[in-house]
């Protein structure tokens, strides 16, 4: 199945049903009181995380989604039926952004999590709601409000503990093949990896972590060059990044300059991503003598003024990979639990959150009644008119 990690959709919540104007009609009661019921609420639109999905491709072909309208109110004080909510299933790791405002609505990071993205319209009020001591036969009612409409951008961000980054042909795919059961394509030409790959590294039955491999990054990626820039977002949720450096590039380029390119592009793309824990992993040590390899790696470390963790491996023959994965596992286990990200420190507000309060308050002011004139039992009073 084709991997699609970004789509644009339009969601429309259901409109609220209108209130009803109706009066009680019975034998021997010529002028019955009001009995018009309220309408039903319109359906909300939710996104729900489904672990059985791993791509957003379905929404590439079906972009418009609308919840049903609430029923209108009925006589005899019958409330209209509220509409069912519309639930759209998306992969775990999906982020929703409002395209019109740029507001990030939220992330779906675990199975079964639901997120409201469009609020259904409120129900209209029937004329029974407007009965008072001074208005025994109200003909007022209110219409249901329209459902909220949003244009959304859905982004799928892979959930992984470890992310691999580096230039094309640095050996990232070979590394993920050597430490996990993942089988990404490996070849001797650039951009063999065209989509992100995930692999599970199991040290024993109780200890494991997920590792992500994205397409290689090239110079100018932050400005749109190559494939890496559109997939860098998949590393945002990783807890640690492994910068894979090819010490013997096939094109004869300088590995130090190649490493500087990656660091520069990372900083330009996202400060948060650039600030994540990052280890340097020198790869392809099997291509040179041990003394020559040490000379090359020492020069790169000095050129980068690198003070962090350094590992030297050969992903092809799996030399040094076991020690690397063990240290990564220990590092992840010692990290403090991740705190749930709060978006802008406030809750997303929807269009009709205060509709009922404002509507009822407005009609209360119109009645202009004193407390002494009002009796809650008036709602149940049956009035008989005689000529």
From Swiss-Prot:
Mg(2+) binds at residues 173, 193. Pfam families: GTP1_OBG, MMR_HSR1. HAMAP family: GTPase_Obg (MF_01454). GTP binds at residues 166-173, 191-195, 213-216, 283-286, 314-316. An essential GTPase which binds GTP, GDP and possibly (p)ppGpp with moderate affinity, with high nucleotide exchange rates and a fairly low GTP hydrolysis rate. Plays a role in control of the cell cycle, stress response, ribosome biogenesis and in those bacteria that undergo differentiation, in morphogenesis control. Its cofactor is Mg(2+). GO terms for biological process: ribosome biogenesis. Belongs to the TRAFAC class OBG-HflX-like GTPase superfamily. OBG GTPase family. Residues 1-159 form the Obg domain. One of its GO terms (cellular component) is cytoplasm. It is found in: Cytoplasm. Residues 160-333 form the OBG-type G domain. It comes from the Bacteria. InterPro entries: G_OBG, GTP-bd, GTP-bd_Obg/CgtA, GTP1-OBG_CS, GTP1_OBG_dom, GTP1_OBG_dom_sf, OBG_GTPase, P-loop_NTPase. Residues 367-387 have a biased composition (Acidic residues). Monomer. Keywords: Cytoplasm, GTP-binding, Hydrolase, Magnesium, Metal-binding, Nucleotide-binding. Its main location: cytoplasm. It is an enzyme of class 3 (hydrolase). Residues 361-387 are annotated as: Disordered. The lineage of its organism: Bacteria, Pseudomonadati, Pseudomonadota, Gammaproteobacteria, Alteromonadales. SUPFAM superfamilies: Obg GTP-binding protein N-terminal domain, P-loop containing nucleoside triphosphate hydrolases. This is GTPase Obg. GO terms for molecular function: GTP binding; GTPase activity; magnesium ion binding. Its EC number is 3.6.5.-. It comes from Colwellia psychrerythraea (strain 34H / ATCC BAA-681).
